[in-house]
């Protein structure tokens, strides 16, 4: 691999971090007490031109953990009317996270990256719920950095002057279906496209690769 081609890799682009786009749907705002009900993760890949693209998608509906709080307003907001319905096909937090982390570790290794980093819209919220679930499940091998993230609310505010996901996507020239919004699957896919678009636009403007200083 030439020096020029080496610069056009995920490992080089994000300082060894492997970006993974995540969205969660929950039964409230408190990560310690409120249920995690849905999670989706989208991995990313970089092509030979150094452009970023969505790669693999993994998605789960999740059973409320024992004793979890369920805020009525939150359930109305995300459209999950009955978190205990067998029609949801929900699995435990532990099963969902283990499968997601298995995929992340596999693709992180293939990209020769040292650690995963979460990409999310208002990322502190999503990371707080994932970290709380990790603690409940006593998971030791967690691929994500415990606090560092790429927040697309901040990035889209810089790039497009919009911080709301729907408005940021539209400002970026993307379609956004409000009827599909607040589904972890749909929101993660849209966030992944938004993040890739911002990164690729910055590259097209000459912001990457950096010119090495001698």
Curated annotation (Swiss-Prot):
Site-annotated residues for Important for substrate binding and specificity: 29, 77, 125, 147
MF terms (GO), sorted A to Z: 3'-5' exonuclease activity; magnesium ion binding; nucleic acid binding; RNA exonuclease activity, producing 5'-phosphomonoesters
Pfam families linked: RNase_T
Binding site for Mg(2+) 2: 23, 25, 182, 187
Protein residues bound to Mg(2+) 1: 23
GO cellular component, one term: cytosol
Catalytic site: 182
Cofactor requirements of the protein: Mg(2+)
Role description: Trims short 3' overhangs of a variety of RNA species, leaving a one or two nucleotide 3' overhang. Responsible for the end-turnover of tRNA: specifically removes the terminal AMP residue from uncharged tRNA (tRNA-C-C-A). Also appears to be involved in tRNA biosynthesis.
Family statement drawn from the similarity comment of this UniProt entry: Belongs to the RNase T family.
Protein name: Ribonuclease T
Species of origin: Vibrio campbellii (strain ATCC BAA-1116)
Lineage, broadest ranks: Bacteria, Pseudomonadati, Pseudomonadota, Gammaproteobacteria, Vibrionales
Gene from which the chain derives: rnt
């Amino acid at each position: 691999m030439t020096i020029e081609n080496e610069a056009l890799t995920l490992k080089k682009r994000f300082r060894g971090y492997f970006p993974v786009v995540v969205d969660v749907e929950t039964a409230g705002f408190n990560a310690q007490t409120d249920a995690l009900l849905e999670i989706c993760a989208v991995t990313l890949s970089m092509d030979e031109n150094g452009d970023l693209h969505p790669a693999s998608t993994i998605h789960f509906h999740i059973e409320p953990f024992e004793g979890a709080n369920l805020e009525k307003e939150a359930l109305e907001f995300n459209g999950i009317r009955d978190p205990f319905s067998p029609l949801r096909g929900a699995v435990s937090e532990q099963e969902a996270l283990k499968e997601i982390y298995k995929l992340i570790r596999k693709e992180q290794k293939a990209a020769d990256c040292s650690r995963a980093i979460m990409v999310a819209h208002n990322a502190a919220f999503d990371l707080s719920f994932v970290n709380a679930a990790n603690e409940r499940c006593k998971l030791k091998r967690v691929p994500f950095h415990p606090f560092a993230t790429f927040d697309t609310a901040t990035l889209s505010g810089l790039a497009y002057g919009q911080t709301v996901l729907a408005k940021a996507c539209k400002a970026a020239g993307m379609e956004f279906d409000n009827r599909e919004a607040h589904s972890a699957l749909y929101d993660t896919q849209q966030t992944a496209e938004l993040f890739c678009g911002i990164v690729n636009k910055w590259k097209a403007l000459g912001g990457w690769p950096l010119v090495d200083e001698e």
